[in-house]
């Protein structure tokens, strides 16, 4: 949930602290939410089963899906179709053993992936991108930073220095 610095500290021309040791440390850190990430979800994604099911669902339901021209409208419809349950049955028949506890834990990610791919198939890449990013914490935080005009790092406040006084010779 945080970034640890192991390299030496350096100061930029405007006084910002940066660290050596390789890599780039972001000015703003947003922790990744891995709560719904399970072995079931990873296998479903990596095996291509989500893409295959979404393509099959799109083909089987194209006439109905053609009625939706807007991403949110299609998303609302898809949310009512119990796609995660349908996918779990499909995946089980195609070699991914049904794991109800893991499916429940990954429900939001599975639903987001399935709906997103169907939206991509029926609308376009822009609609898919908007759908996938609508509640992404990094996107939300980025918009908040821009809204607050804090997008670029500010020069650190100068440390007050004591005025130099010359020592009197004795």
Q: Where are the language model's segments positioned?
A:
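Conserved functional hotspot residues or short segments at active or partner-binding sites
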Residues: 1-170
């Amino acid at each position: 949930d945080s970034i640890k610095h192991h390299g030496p500290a350096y100061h930029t021309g405007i006084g910002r602290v940066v660290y050596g040791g390789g890599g780039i440390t972001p000015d703003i850190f947003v922790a990744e939410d891995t709560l719904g990430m399970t072995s079931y979800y990873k296998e479903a994604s990596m095996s291509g089963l989500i893409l295959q099911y979404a393509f099959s669902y799109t083909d089987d339901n194209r006439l109905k899906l053609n009625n939706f021209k807007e991403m949110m409208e299609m998303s609302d419809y898809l949310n009512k179709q119990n796609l995660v349950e349908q996918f779990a049955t499909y995946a089980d028949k195609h070699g991914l053993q049904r794991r109800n506890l893991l499916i429940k834990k990954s429900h939001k990610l599975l639903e987001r992936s399935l709906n997103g791919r169907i939206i991509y198939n029926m609308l376009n890449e822009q609609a898919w991108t908007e759908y996938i990013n609508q509640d992404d914490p990094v996107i939300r935080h980025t918009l908040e930073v821009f809204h607050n005009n804090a997008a670029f790092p500010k020069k650190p406040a100068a440390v007050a220095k004591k005025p130099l006084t010359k020592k009197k010779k004795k």
